Design a protein with these regions (language model features):
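N-terminal helical capping/dimerization or prosegment-like subdomains
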Residues: 1-87, 324-326, 343
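Active-site metal-coordination/substrate-binding segment of hydrolases
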Residues: 74-150, 156, 168-169
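Histidine-centered divalent metal-coordination motifs
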Residues: 80, 260, 382
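Short proline/glycine- and acidic-rich turn/helix-capping motifs at secondary-structure junctions
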Residues: 247-253, 352-366
Length: 392
């Protein structure tokens, strides 16, 4: 099959580039576009490409689409076309789909497509589509009805899959090309919560930080009180963080480094750096900082084979005298969300759950994982074992 796929290489690269050029990060709903027009345009391009290949396709109200191949018991391949916001610090335009083969640019040698979504998950979605085309062109008839389901809201709550479950039937079995090789049998759960911290004497007039709850905050801005403004002049932030202070407007801008919310250690949290400064002289801010960034509750002691619990406070605002912070928690697969909420309840803080996804676990010795691993090892003439993933 490898030599057959080589015939489609240039088409795959071209199609990936076309999908990457759509900025399919979440936008406000408008008309028939629940996640913004450009995300819908990306979905329609993908489905048109599949239709041109001769596949049956369905667009479910611009929430989610599917491509059908074969007959029989249904089998799902779950992918997505939405992306997290581009953020800053790109070497190439995030939606430019620049093709570059300069090894000095980092990563493995060879041709690379640069852009948001190349790996998560537009590249894999397009590649799977061409795999189905290659099988179809070779005359292969699957014994199952394969449903390539492409969502448009995987990064921000899975409203796409919620809608799919209302208008169609999700297959009982499948896999997702949205992880690492060779095969992932377990993933952490997701818990997003928004906490409100009353501030008796807030050291700022306004504060805004972060774009999305699943992205490490790389930009935070606050208008300081005169007292706080005096203190910032002699403050030195941690390495990897920059403080820019405008004396005329008393505006402090903190810049860090973005990363996926599931891997906060790869970023530098601007919100955390800002709160750390405020915590150095304000008790209410210290309360928030200690809980969210210093792990006062020892939540990060929770761990299993999928790794340790991670916390990434990513978005914050100042509302009616309260600092409101939304935090991304990824918790080990063998634990339950109630273990976290019980601890938060004891802190006597006001909070609400804004998103929850249960952990995933599939028997590594079951038929599905054994089949996937068998194909992988046979194709690469290599012996590997399935693994788990500590993030989603």
């Amino acid at each position: 099959m490898t030599h057959v796929m080589e015939n489609y290489f240039n088409d795959i690269v071209e199609s990936i580039c076309k999908t990457v050029k759509f900025d399919s990060s979440l936008k406000p709903a408008e008309g028939n576009y629940p996640f913004g027009k450009e995300t819908a345009d990306c979905l329609n391009y993908f489905l048109s490409l599949a239709a041109d290949m001769g596949f049956e396709t369905h667009n479910y109200d611009n929430y989610v689409g599917e491509v059908i191949f074969g007959e029989g018991k249904e089998f799902a391949i779950l992918a997505h076309l939405d992306v997290v916001p581009a953020g800053s610090g790109w070497r190439f335009p995030p939606f430019g789909a620049v093709i570059n083969d300069d090894p000095s640019e980092g990563g493995m040698p060879g041709v690379k497509i640069w852009g948001r979504g190349t790996m998560d998950d537009k590249g894999p979605a397009v590649t799977v589509l061409y795999c189905l085309k290659a099988l179809k062109d070779e005359g292969f008839q699957p014994r199952r009805k394969i449903k390539l389901i492409v969502g448009c809201n995987e990064e921000c709550g899975w409203a796409c899959i919620d809608h799919y479950n209302k208008v169609a039937k999700m297959p009982e079995e499948g896999f997702s090309p949205d992880a690492d090789f060779p095969a992932i049998y377990a993933e952490k759960g997701i818990l997003h919560f928004s906490a409100s911290f009353p501030l008796k004497n807030p050291p700022f007039r306004s504060l805004a930080a972060g774009e999305r709850v699943n992205m490490v905050c790389d930009d935070a801005i606050a208008v300081l009180t005169p007292d706080a403004a005096e203190k910032v002049l002699g403050y030195t932030p941690d390495e990897g963080i920059s403080f820019d202070f405008d004396k005329e407007s008393n505006t402090l801008r903190v810049r860090g480094k973005s990363a996926h919310g599931s891997t906060p250690e790869k970023g530098a949290n601007a919100l955390g750096a800002m709160l750390k400064f405020f915590a150095s002289f304000d008790e209410d801010c210290k309360n928030a900082y200690d809980l969210l960034f210093a792990d006062r509750c020892c939540l990060k002691e929770m761990k299993d084979e999928t790794g340790t619990l991670t916390m990434s406070p990513d978005v914050a605002n100042f509302e009616n005298g309260n600092l409101v912070v939304t935090t991304d928690i990824r918790f080990p697969a063998t634990h339950k969300k109630e273990e976290i909420t019980n601890i938060l309840d004891k802190e006597n803080i006001q909070y609400k759950i804004v998103n929850y996804q249960a952990p995933l676990y599939t028997d590594p010795n079951g038929k599905l994982i054994k089949t996937l691993m068998g194909v992988y090892n046979l194709s690469l003439i290599h012996i590997s074992e399935p693994t788990r993933r500590s993030y989603i």
